[in-house]
Swiss-Prot record:
HAMAP family: lon_bact (MF_01973)
Name recorded for this polypeptide: Lon protease
Subunit structure: Homohexamer. Organized in a ring with a central cavity.
Domain Lon proteolytic, first and last residues per copy: 603-781
Active-site residues annotated for this sequence: S688, K731
SMART domains documented for this protein: AAA, LON
Gene: lon
A Gene Ontology BP annotation from the UniProt entry: protein quality control for misfolded or incompletely synthesized proteins
Domain of life: Bacteria
Keywords: ATP-binding, Cytoplasm, Hydrolase, Nucleotide-binding, Protease, Serine protease, Stress response
Family according to the record: Belongs to the peptidase S16 family.
ATP-binding listed as a keyword: yes
Amino acid sequence: MSTKFEKLEKLARESFQSPEVPETLPLIHLRNGMIIFPQTVVPVHVAREKTLLALEQSIESYQQFVFVTSQKDPSVEEPSFDQLYEIGTVSKVLQVVQLPDGSFRVLLEGLERARAYEVVQDNPFLVKLEILKVNYRKTKKLEALIRSVRESFAKYAYYTQRYSQETLSAMSEISDANRLADFVASLLPLQLKQRQSLLEQLKPAKRLEMILEILSHENEILEIERELDTKVKKRIEENQKEFFLREKLKAITEELGEKDTEADQLKARLQKLKLPEHAKQKATLEIERLEKMSPYSAEATVIRTYLDWLFNLPWDNSTEDRQDISQAEKILQASHYGLKEAKERILEFLAVRKRSNSVKAPILCFVGPPGVGKTSLARAVSQALNRKFAHMSLGGLRDEAEIKGHRRTYVGAMPGRILQLIRTAQSKNPVLLLDEIDKMAVSFQGDPAAALLEVLDPEQNKEFVDHYLEIPFDLSNVLFITTANVTHTIPPALLDRMEIIELEGYTDYEKSIIARQYIIPKLMGENALNEATFKITQGAIKKIIHTYTREAGVRQLTRMLQRLMRKSALKIEQGAKSVVIKSKDLEHFLGPQPVQNDIMLSKPEIGAVHGLAWTEYGGVVMVVESLLMPGKGDLILTGRLGEVMRESARIALSVARSFCGQDCKEKFQQSDIHINLPEGAVPKDGPSAGITMTVAMISSVLGKPVRNDTAMTGEITLRGKILAVGGVKEKILAAHRHGIKRILLPKTNEKDLKRIPPQVKDKMEFIFVEDIEKAVEKSCS
C-alpha cells in the first residue's frame, strides 16, 4: 500500500498542463462544513478509504482533476449520492503528503463550479458533470458592491485581527467581481449552508450582496463587543487601585497576625449554630460571595444584613409546652371569666400534645364583638402553654409583602412580619396572634389574604418561604390565633383553614362578676389603690353597666372604672382618707348618664315594634315604625336600608295585604305605607327584620297597638312563614340590657336557647312562632 501511495505522491508533484476538464470525474465528498471555492487553494485532510481511492483514480486517470462537494449531514460516515450537494467545485490536486498517523493531507486548487447530474460508479464515486459558467456585465452597481465589500471586509479584519496584511493586499488587487466574491467567501467563518448558498449563486452581484449582508451583521456585533470591552477595561482600571490597596491591607493584616477576617468570623459563627442543612448551604454560599467582594460595596452590606437575619432566626430554639393540664386550666380560669369553648379547645390540644409530640398546632379564630377578650385570651393561652407570645395587627393591611417579605433585589428589603415576629419571640413555637383578620384590604400591591393561605395551612406552612429569606422555614409548630368581629368579610379559602371559636357578648350579670373579680383588682394595682382606700358598691357597678355603658364586651366598662379610680386617687392626694363609690355618687364622678332608653317604647303603640338586630359590635334593639297615610298604595322606606332589607320590606307588604284580606283592600289601594328605622345615619341590612316590618304594617292597617315589652326577630317568606336567623344570643342579651321581657323567635331557633345564660333566660319569656298569624296574635294587645 505504501508503494502505491508513494507513486500517488510522485504523480501529484509532477507538473501538469491541463487541456480541458473531462466530462466525467472522481468525486471527493468533504465534511465538517468544508467547501472549496473557485480560484482558492485549500488543504484537505483525507483518511476515508473511499476518498483515497477517488484521489488515486484522479491522479492516475483524470490528469489530477477531481470534483469536490460537501455532505449535507457531516455525521454520516459513508453517505450516498443523494446525501451530497449536487453543486460543487472542479478542483486540481496540487500536492499529497502522508501524515504520521497514516492519513493524507491533500492540497486542492478550486477551478470552477460544476453540477453532478449522474453517477457512473459508486466505489469510488465517478460522476458526470455540467460546468456552470459565470457570465456578467460590469455595471456601476457592481463596482459599488465591490468597493463596499472591500471596505466591510477591511473593517471586519480590523475588528477580528485574523488576517495578515498580505491577505488584505491580495484582496485589494482583485478587480474581478466573481473572483473577489469567491475570495472573500473562502476567508469568512461561515456555516455550511451559508457557504453552499454562496457557491450555488452564479450571479456575482447577488453573491456580493449576500457577502455584504453577512459582513455588515458581523461588523455590527463586533462593534458592540468592542464597546463593551472598552467599558469593562475602563472599569477594571478604575478598580485596580482599590483592589491593590485591599490586597496590600490584607497582607499587612496577615503580617500583624490578625488573620481572622470577617468571612472567617462568620464561618466560625455558622459552625456553632444548629441550622438545618439547606440553611447552612445558603449561608455558606453567601459568605463565599461576601469574601470575594469589596467590604465597602453596597452588595456586601446587603449580604451582611441577610446573614444577620439567617443567623438570628430561632431555627432550633423552642419552649417546652406545659405538661400539667390542671395548672394550665387554672391559668386560663384566672385570666378570663366564662369562654368555656375556647378554654376547652386549648386544653384538648395540650392533652393530645402530651400524648404525641407529632400533633400539629391548631389554627384558631376567635370571633366576637369588641371588648369580649379575644386578644387578652390569646395572651392567656401563651401563658397556659408556657410559650412565647407575639402579636400582629392585620387591620387595613393591603400589601402582601408585609406577610411574605420583599425580594432582596429591592433597596431596603426586609423579611415579612411573620418572620419578624418569630425572630422577636426567639422561639420557633410561639403563640402568634394575627389580630383583626377580617379587616384586611386588597390593592394593586397584592392580596394579603392570599399570602396568608400558605401561612395558615398546616399542610404548607412546614416549608414557608419568605421572599427575602428565599429558603423554607418551618411554621408548623407555631400556634396561630386570629381574631375577627365577623366572618363574612374573611375570604372563604382562608376561613376554611381556621377553626372558628365564637366569643359571644356578656350578660349584665357576667359583666358585674368580671368587673368585681378581674377588672377592679387589676385597675387598683395600676392606680396604687387598695381595699382600705377605695371601695365601690355592687349597686354602683350595676348602674355603670346599665346606664353608662351599653356594649357586648367590657371595654367601656373598664374605661368608666378607670376614670373612677383616677378621680378617687386625686381625692386621696387632696386629703381624703378613703373613697367609697355608691350609685348616687356616679353622676358626680362620671357626669350625666350617656346611655338613655329614649328609643324604647314606653307604652303599646300602633305601628311601632321593637326589632332585634346583630352587628359586628354585638346585638342591638331598634324600633321599626310604620305609618299609614293617604296615597296610591306606594311603599316608602327610610333609615338607610340596604338592598336585602328593602326586598324584605316589599315581601312584608305583600304578606300584610294577604293577612288583612279583602276588608282592607281599599285601605291599601288608597294609602301609602311609610316604614322607618330610626338612626338614619347608621346603615342597616339583612333579612331578620322581616317579621318586625310585617307586624308593624299589620298593626298600622288594623289599628292594633303592639306590646312595648315585646321584641322580635325572624325572616319572613311570601307565604307568611318565619325562618331562622343568626346571632340569637347577642340579640337576646341586647333585649335583656334594654329591659325587654318577651321575645318572639322563629320556631327553628328554639335550639339556640341552650346557649343563653340561666340568669337571662329565667327572667324572659320566649315565644316561638312559625307563621305571621301567631306572631300577630302574640304581639298585638
